Amino acid sequence: MTRSLKKGPFVADHLLKKIEDLNLKKEKKIIITWSRASTIVPTMIGHTIAVYNGQEHLPIYITDRMIGHKLGEFAPTRNFRGHTKSDKKSRR
């Protein structure tokens, strides 16, 4: 079920405050966050946000095409290494 329009998008307060402070100072610094559920809003464009994936913070440069998506969509948490090759010789 989608979020109600009257509520607006969810963005963590601490993250929004950091971005607004950087916009006022006209600075570009990497912002570290654990908030994967935060929605990308237009004020974030041009910033680099390091999103935690469970092991490390992955830096993500925010572009205009990412608006409306969640930060966690761009930091994969699982590492798929492919299916194991069936090796019949090693079974004998």
Swiss-Prot record:
> Which InterPro entries does this UniProt record tie to the protein?
Ribosomal_uS19, Ribosomal_uS19_bac-type, Ribosomal_uS19_CS, Ribosomal_uS19_SF
Tell me which domain of life the UniProt entry assigns to the organism this sequence originates from.
Eukaryota
The record's section on Gene3D superfamilies has:
30s Ribosomal Protein S19, Chain A
A Gene Ontology BP annotation from the UniProt entry = ribosomal small subunit assembly
Q: Name one GO molecular function term.
A: structural constituent of ribosome
Q: Where is this gene product found?
A: Plastid, Chloroplast
Keywords from the UniProt entry: Chloroplast, Plastid, Ribonucleoprotein, Ribosomal protein, RNA-binding, rRNA-binding
Sorted alphabetically, the Gene Ontology cellular component annotations on this record are:
chloroplast; mitochondrial small ribosomal subunit
Whether rRNA-binding counts among this entry's keywords is yes
- What's one Pfam family the UniProt record gives for this protein? Ribosomal_S19
State the PANTHER family in the record: RIBOSOMAL PROTEIN S19P FAMILY MEMBER (PTHR11880), SMALL RIBOSOMAL SUBUNIT PROTEIN US19M (PTHR11880:SF8)
According to its UniProt entry, what is the function of this protein? Protein S19 forms a complex with S13 that binds strongly to the 16S ribosomal RNA.
Q: Which family does it belong to?
A: Belongs to the universal ribosomal protein uS19 family.
The protein depicted here goes by the name Small ribosomal subunit protein uS19c
